[in-house]
């Protein structure tokens, strides 16, 4: 199926960056498509919801953290589309560099801080759409 014959699912994705080198990834829980795969936190936009508000809501629901939408703490980095067997998604990828609270897996998901600068991640498997995000962020931070 092509994107034209499937609805596009809008998703807000938050890359939490700690100490300019570590990003937080979560393991998809059982019962979800791609269960056991690692991804960046986030979720679907609700009808008429902005990316910023969806990101705030999702990070609170999934991790119990509050984020500021101040431009010095948060920014939308990129938009990518990915065609998964279960959904065609448009991912609004946001960099979050400051938050309140300590991230906890409130949906029973495992969490892991991963170094952007090691040759490979220590978690596996990783959702296919996460790789372009990682590569973009590495290039962005090296500017």
Model-derived regions: residue spans:
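Generic C-terminal helix-cap and adjacent flexible tail
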Residues: 4-6, 138-143
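Conserved N-terminal beta-strand and adjoining loop/helix that marks the start
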Residues: 2-23, 44
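A short coil-to-beta-strand element that immediately follows conserved catalytic motifs
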Residues: 66-77
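A generic structural micro-feature
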Residues: 5-8, 37, 85-88, 105-108
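Conserved Nudix-box catalytic region and its N-terminal flanking loop in Nudix hydrolases
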Residues: 22-61
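NUDIX/MutT-family hydrolases
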Residues: 95, 103-139
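Active-site-adjacent beta-strand/loop module that shapes the phosphate/pyrophosphate-binding cleft
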Residues: 9, 18, 77-102, 116, ...
């Amino acid at each position: 199926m092509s994107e034209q014959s499937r609805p596009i699912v809008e998703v807000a994705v938050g890359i939490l960056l700690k100490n300019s080198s570590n990003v937080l990834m979560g393991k998809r829980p059982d019962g979800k498509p791609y269960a056991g795969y690692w991804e960046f936190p986030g979720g679907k936009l609700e009808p008429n919801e902005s990316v910023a508000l969806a990101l705030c809501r999702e990070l609170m629901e999934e991790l119990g953290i509050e984020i500021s939408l101040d431009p010095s703490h948060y920014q939308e980095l990129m938009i990518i589309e990915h065609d998964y067997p279960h959904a065609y998604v448009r991912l609004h990828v946001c960099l979050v560099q400051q938050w309140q609270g300590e991230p906890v897996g409130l949906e029973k998901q495992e969490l892991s801080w991963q170094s952007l600068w090691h040759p490979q991640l220590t978690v596996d498997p990783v959702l296919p759409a996460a790789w372009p995000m990682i590569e973009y962020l590495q290039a962005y931070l090296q500017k």
